[in-house]
A protein has these predicted regions:
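DNA major-groove recognition helix of helix-turn-helix/homeodomain DNA-binding modules
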Residues: 28, 47-62
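Alpha-helical residues within the helix-turn-helix
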Residues: 14, 25, 54
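Short alpha-helical DNA-recognition segment
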Residues: 17-35
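A short, Lys/Arg-rich alpha-helix, primarily the initiator
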Residues: 1-15
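Short, charged recognition helix plus adjacent turn
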Residues: 64-77
Length: 77
């Protein structure tokens, strides 16, 4: 079963005034990796999710959620 993963990386990055390149440097990955994660093309590893959270000054749970299965438009806890 494939679950959809919602992420808030773009919003957090924009809130901090960072470009994809800035975040990529901070997380030690390529800008393309940031782009593919933001667009839901690539689901990050645990290590990458932790690096992104650290770079954005937040926690993984704030960046990534699995939508509630009962309500497709909602985000679970």
């Amino acid at each position: 079963m494939s679950e959809r993963l919602v992420n808030h990386i773009r919003e957090e990055r924009a809130r901090l005034g960072l470009t994809q390149a800035d975040l990529a440097t901070m997380a030690q990955v390529s800008r393309k990796t940031i782009n593919t994660v933001e667009n839901g093309v690539f689901i990050p590893s645990t290590v990458l999710a932790l690096r992104l959270a650290r770079a954005l000054g937040t926690n993984v749970e704030s960046l990534f959620q699995i939508p509630d299965a009962g309500r497709p438009d909602s985000v679970g806890p």
